[in-house]
């Protein structure tokens, strides 16, 4: 048995916030109390003769495990970057107990076999590993997957993350189907036709490197389109990793128009912590899609978190090898890790600054 004493227990789902003691028996919470261990033993017959490990949590917060709905564990196919086992260890170190993997592996999670591989390997870890399936076969944007089958086999949502779905007719069909099934569709909002070099904001950062970069219009245009499709179809939409102030405002207005509450949006720790100055300073280590933008965008994202426009913090944990990140800025892949640092970044940049309470962050 485990006895956690003197901790501050926070449960955001119920707005619970008290200093209490917690008794855990066989891996499950048996009792939450302000009584002492001896008093609790006298009340609980099943724990009188059991050995009890005691953890003094004075000055610490005890909370439910964190959930990250947007991670890349690179497994199968790209395991020199990360695999499900190492990704799970990183998640647990960061306080996460559940994650949702993206489908852009090799092969893509668009079939029963790959889905089963991911779920079976995830089940061998100490983490709750869930996964999305792709919206389109091979992330091609051309042919829909069998959503019914993949959902029945364990997928928890659908996304072509990493690649936008440019065919609006196909997207609308997919979102109608997802609405029928009651599952979310998560969309990567960057129109590649408007981007000269991804991962670097068109502005001060792109000028520093003498390249074309990625303009905010690439994100704005697709967020605007996809919100309209979601409102028409009634689908549950998750707008992934917002980077622009205009994108935040579009989501804010769409939420006001949604009578079902099906519009959701996520922000990453790097987008509420950093701006394009980090790309100038750190180069490829701060290169990600969508890119870090201006300070005004970072502040707008924080405002979106404060007023509930952005209702998800997701890491977009996306590891690469050191060799890949050592390439020139126009050749290095976009992506940054985040599972081990997300909570501390939230506490430092949102809680300690007075933007959110600990409960709101969690």
Feature map (PLM): residue ranges:
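Divalent metal-binding pocket/active-site signature
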Residues: 106, 161-246, 267, 312, ...
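Histidine/acidic-residue-rich catalytic or RNA/ligand-binding cores of hydrolases
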Residues: 111, 171, 192-206, 222, ...
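His/Asp/Glu-enriched, well-ordered alpha-helical/loop segment
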Residues: 208-236, 285, 306, 312-313, ...
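Metal-associated gating/positioning segment near the N- to mid-region
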Residues: 57-122
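Divalent metal-dependent hydrolysis catalytic cores, especially in the metallo-beta-lactamase
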Residues: 85-109, 125-137, 151-166, 182-186, ...
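Active-site metal-binding motif and surrounding structural segment of the metallo-beta-lactamase
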Residues: 39-62
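Divalent metal-coordination and catalytic microenvironments
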Residues: 7, 22, 27, 59, ...
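N-terminal metal-binding scaffold of metallo-dependent hydrolase/deaminase domains
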Residues: 1-46
């Amino acid at each position: 048995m485990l006895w956690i004493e003197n901790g501050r227990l926070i449960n955001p789902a119920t707005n619970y916030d008290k200093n209490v003691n917690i008794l855990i028996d066989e891996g499950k919470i048996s009792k939450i109390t302000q009584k002492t261990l001896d008093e609790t033993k006298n009340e609980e017959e099943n724990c009188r003769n059991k050995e009890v490990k005691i953890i003094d949590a004075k000055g610490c917060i005890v909370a439910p495990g964190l959930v990250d709905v947007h991670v890349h564990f690179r497994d199968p196919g790209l395991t020199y970057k990360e695999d499900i086992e190492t990704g799970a260890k990183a998640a647990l170190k960061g306080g996460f107990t559940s994650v949702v993997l993206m489908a852009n592996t090799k092969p893509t999670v668009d079939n029963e076999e790959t889905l089963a591989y991911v779920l079976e390997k995830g089940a061998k870890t100490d983490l709750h590993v869930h996964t999305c399936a792709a919206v389109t076969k091979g992330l091609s944007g051309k042919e829909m997957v069998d959503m019914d089958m993949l959902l029945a086999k364990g997928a928890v949502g659908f996304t072509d993350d990493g690649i936008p779905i440019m065919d609006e007719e196909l997207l609308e069909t997919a979102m109608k189907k997802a609405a029928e099934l009651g599952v979310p569709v998560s969309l990567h909002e960057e129109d590649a036709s408007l981007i000269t070099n991804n991962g670097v904001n068109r502005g001060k950062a792109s000028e520093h490197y003498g390249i074309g970069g990625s303009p905010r219009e690439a994100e704005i245009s697709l967020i605007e389109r996809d919100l309209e499709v979601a409102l028409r179809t009634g689908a549950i939409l998750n707008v992934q990793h917002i980077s622009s102030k205009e994108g935040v405002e579009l989501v804010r207005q769409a939420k006001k128009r949604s009578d079902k509450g099906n519009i959701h949006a996520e922000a990453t720790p790097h987008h509420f912590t950093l701006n394009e100055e980090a790309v100038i300073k750190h180069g490829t280590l701060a290169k990600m899609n969508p890119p870090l933008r201006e300070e005004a965008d970072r502040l707008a994202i924080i405002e979106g978190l404060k007023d509930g426009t952005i209702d998800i913090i997701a890491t977009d944990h996306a590891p690469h090898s050191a060799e890949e990140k050592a390439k020139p800025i126009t050749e290095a892949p976009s992506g940054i890790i985040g599972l081990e640092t997300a909570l501390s970044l939230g506490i430092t940049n949102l809680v300690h600054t007075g933007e959110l309470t600990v409960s709101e962050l969690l």
